[in-house]
Amino acid sequence: MPYDAKDPRASLTPGPAVDKTPTDFAGTDYVKFYEIPPDETSPGVKTWYARGQNLIIAYTEASVDTIFSRSGQPDEYVLLLPDRTMSVDITTGEGVKRVSGYFISIIPPGESSVRVLAKGRLFRLFTVLSVDLAKKCSNAKSYAKPHPNVAPFKPWPTPPSGYRLRTYSLDVPPQEGRFGRIWRCSTMMVNYLDIQNGPRDTAKMSPHAHDDFEQISLAVEGVFVHHIRWPWIPNMNKWRADEHEECASVSVAVIPPPSIHTTGAVGKGANQLVDLFCPPRLDFSQKQGWVLNSDEYPMP
C-alpha cells in the first residue's frame, strides 16, 4: 500500500509474503469505554478491560492509594501514564521506584504492585497469558474462538541484562524520518504517536494492511475516525462492508488482518493515539533509530 512520500513508513521494507489466501475475516472490535459501564468498580476506582487476540488493555480512573498487584505474573507487562499530573510507586523484587506521569514502564514477570500517588488515569497492557484478566474483558465473547489470519503469539527474546523494571519518559520530540515514539519489550510494542493538533490532512492518509497481526489503536485524547476496508475473496458471502467508525476517548479499535485501514484525527483540539502490537513488529524494529530502547531488547 502506498504511503504519502513524507510519511516515514514509506521507507519500510516489505516483509515476506504470507503464503495464504484468506477464506474468512474477523470484524473490527470497537470498545468505547465512555459508552459502557466499567468492568470493575471500588470506591473512587473504575476499570475497563478490552482485548485483542494476544493483548489485554486495562484502563483505570484511579484515586490516591489505589494499589494494583500482580502475583505470579507470567510475563512482562506495560504501565502507561499519559497524564503529567499522575504519579505512582512501582514495587518489584528490586524495591520501590517512583514514576511520574507521562512515562511508560515495563514491569518484569513475577510479583509487582503499582500504588497510585495522584488521582488520574493509567493503562496496563498485558498478554492474554494473564488469563484472569482476559476473562474480564468486555469483548471477551468476540475471542471465544481465535480470530482467523492472526499468527500465534510468540514472545521475543529475553533481554540480555535480564528482566527488571524499566521506565522511559514519553517526552521525546519528533524527529525527521522517525515514526512516532516506539518502545518494545519481550511481549509487545507501544507506539505513542506524535500528537495531532486538530484534524488530520485528508490528502495525506495512510491506507495499509497487515498480513498476519492485529493493530490495536488506543485513543487517549481527542476524536478519531477509523476507516476499514476488507479485500474481496471468491466467497462473496464473506465480503464485508466498509467501515468509517468515529471513536472518541478513551476507546480501543482492534483492527484485524488483512483489512486495509487508516485512521484520521477529527477532533478540533489535541488528538493522541497509541498503536499497540503483540508481539512487537519486526519491520518497525528493523528501522534504525525507530525503537527507542532497541539496545535493551534483541530481535528474534
Q: Could you say what each language-model-derived stretch is?
A:
Residues P2-Y30, P82, P207, E214-P300:
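C-terminal functional regions that serve as terminal interaction/effector modules
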Residues L79:
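Short, conserved beta-strand segments within well-ordered enzyme catalytic domains
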Residues A203-A209:
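Active-site environment of non-heme Fe oxygenases that use a 2-His-1-carboxylate facial triad
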Residues R51-G52, S71-Q73, A209-D211:
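A short catalytic or substrate-binding loop motif that flags glycine-/basic-rich loops and adjacent residues
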Residues I57, D211-E214:
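Generic structural microfeature
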Residues M1-I56, V131-D201, M299-P300:
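A short, N-terminal "cap"/entry segment at the start of jelly-roll beta-barrel domains
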Residues K119-R164, G264-P300:
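Double-stranded beta-helix
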Residues I56-D75, T85-R124, Q196-A203, H227-T262, ...:
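A cross-kingdom feature marking solvent-exposed beta-strand/loop segments within repeated
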